[in-house]
Amino acid sequence: NKKVNLEQFRKSILYPLHEDGFDPYREEFNSMMDSNLEAGENNFSAIKLISFGKSDQTPKLAYRSLSQIGEYFKSGLSEIEASFNLLTGEERANHLADMLRGENHLPFTYQDLVRSGQTTKHFIAPPSLSFKHKNHIEIDNRLLQVVYVRDYGMELGDKFIRDLIQSDLEVMMSLHAKGSAKSEAMKKLRTKKTLMESQKIGEQQKMARSGVYLEKVSQVLESNIDEADELLKTMTQTGDKLFDTLFLIGVFADTEDQLNQSLDIVKQVAGSNDLIIDNLTYMQEAAFNSLLPFGKNYLEGVSRSLLTSNIAVNSPWTSVDIQDKGGKFYGINQISSNIITIDRGKLNTPSGLILGTSGSGKGM
């Protein structure tokens, strides 16, 4: 979720004046769009990427598996009319440069790489990166702090991602999910459950020697045993798999005060969605690498096991904004409050039909 140059966006959608007698209408239209820009969320642009990783015996087999996974995702998410494009190497490099350097970089091409004799890292990496602070990173003259979702509520939904995107914060979110074979996951769960039950019996025997007889011991231990039971039951009945999951949030700011204020907003949004955010103290470098869309998690010991259904609902595709570059104003997205701009000249059939109730503004 990155900031866009609002003035450039205005210039791309407002009607230029031509002094041909129709300028009052253009000015009225421009004034209406200007007020919608101020009321909407067009000062931020959300870019959504999916990265897949696959280990196999040979690169050829791994590439074949990746292609199958990509087509599977594309087919599944097409049901909610979310369109996908496979990124080229140049496009991936430019997206990474946008994330790390903002607008302060030239467009990357492989021809430039050949001429310069440099690597893609020279085009992507910012002039300076400092990891000397325990809780944040310095990127040029800006700050970035990476935090993670430590605890999840009983019910998960897509509202947290939607609220965070609409909170007027410059953030990067990364959701890692690494699956395992169902039989292996259930075996591990049963082993953990057995160990916890053995621990429970041990504590009961210890209390019995002291003359205390209780059916239940530690509340946390009892809760963990019940949770393991529920997971096994759900996996057996629904066919869900278990995934090692890590939800990271990177917050950008210009000063430490702004960073703290932004983090407070993130924690408030998380709290309203029954989630708990925690810092990654002295782990910012590994967290930074995990935040980038490489499809690899470099952090250890902070992941959480979630079921397929829990992960599937965390979708960033809650609405689709139609904003063609150089397009004209066609209304307001009722979900995101962003304006809709369409360049009908790019369509196979640029003709259109305007429908609406009486007095709804069809004449405009």
PLM regions: where:
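Pre-P-loop entry segment of helicase/translocase ATPase cores
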Residues: 303-332, 336
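Extended, folded cores of ATP/NTP-driven motor/assembly subunits in large transport
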Residues: 1-316
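Glycine-rich phosphate-binding loop of nucleotide-binding enzymes
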Residues: 325-364
